[in-house]
Amino acid sequence: MKYVGAHVSAAGGVENAPLAAARIRARAFALFTKNQRQWRAAPLKEESITAFKRNCADHGYRPDHILPHDSYLINLGHPEADNLKKSRTAFFDEMKRCEQLGLKFLNFHPGSHLGKISEDACLSRIAESVNMALDRTASVCAVIENTAGQGTNLGHRFEHLARVIDQVEDKTRVGVCLDTCHTFAAGYDLRTASTYEATLKAFDRVVGLKYLRAVHLNDSIKGLASRVDRHQSLGQGALGLDVFRRIMNDRRFENMPLILETKDATIWEQEIKLLYGMIKGAK
């Protein structure tokens, strides 16, 4: 079964995120468990945790179909010691919040070398950061998101993801979220049946489909190999609709969160309906 949703607002408290997801008829959702543009946040209140779990249960959202995303400020491969420590502290806090909410995943962007250290050194720091967070938590899986490769961000090559995973000690608690826009912008074509299959085979060969935990469903404003991260509504960008039709009919994407982060949140409900309508045999 396919579990499609969107990255919804948690304004007013995390307990509101499942309600926002239900309003757009989502079967999965993503959220920030704190303000994504601030380093610090007040601890989660017990009443918010209880209400979040109750609202998820009431609307049929299981933990494995919910994809929390960490703060955009965090850089787990930061070349400077003080900022690396700050990022690691914040990432650990995000992992703990996910545990408190009974969630299974934490989606994160790998990190950036900022032109100050080598790619290999940065990737090793990212893996070390993940290991430190996993050592201090019990159950949450660290889900690395592939990137478009904008600026000095790493994660745009499948080899980057593999190098991090290779250095993570607990392989049962690391996974990958593939973003269709990022994949395309990084130079992996998805537009035709043959290029779609070639890209997935490359991912399986280099990283392993066994590590795939989630997908971000986004069209791309920019073209193939642009290395620019600009999301577009489905079918309105350079990717087109065919890739999303293939994903919705591909058994490799069963039983995982398939999350919209498209440009216009006001049409997410229509996009979800569009995606489910793409399934062969759908009424």
Curated annotation (Swiss-Prot):
Q: Which reaction does it catalyse?
A: Endonucleolytic cleavage to 5'-phosphooligonucleotide end-products
* Recorded superkingdom: Bacteria
Write out the GO biological process terms. Answer: base-excision repair
At which positions is Zn(2+) 2 bound?
Answer: 145, 179, 216, 261
Q: Which residues bind Zn(2+) 1?
A: 69, 109, 145
| Gene3D superfamilies tied to this protein | Divalent-metal-dependent TIM barrel enzymes
The record's function comment reads:
Endonuclease IV plays a role in DNA repair. It cleaves phosphodiester bonds at apurinic or apyrimidinic (AP) sites, generating a 3'-hydroxyl group and a 5'-terminal sugar phosphate.
Protein known as: Probable endonuclease 4
The UniProt annotation places Zn(2+) 3 binding at 182, 229, 231
Cofactor info, note text? Binds 3 Zn(2+) ions.
Recorded family membership: Belongs to the AP endonuclease 2 family.
Cofactors required? Zn(2+)
Which InterPro entries does the UniProt record give?
AP_endonuc_2 (IPR001719), AP_endonuc_F2_Zn_BS (IPR018246), Xyl_isomerase-like_sf (IPR036237), Xyl_isomerase-like_TIM-brl (IPR013022)
Keyword annotations of the record: DNA damage, DNA repair, Endonuclease, Hydrolase, Metal-binding, Nuclease, Zinc
Give GO MF terms, alphabetically.
deoxyribonuclease IV (phage-T4-induced) activity; DNA binding; DNA-(apurinic or apyrimidinic site) endonuclease activity; phosphoric diester hydrolase activity; zinc ion binding
List, alphabetically, the CDD domains matched: AP2Ec
| Assigned EC number | 3.1.21.2
Top EC class, one word:
hydrolase
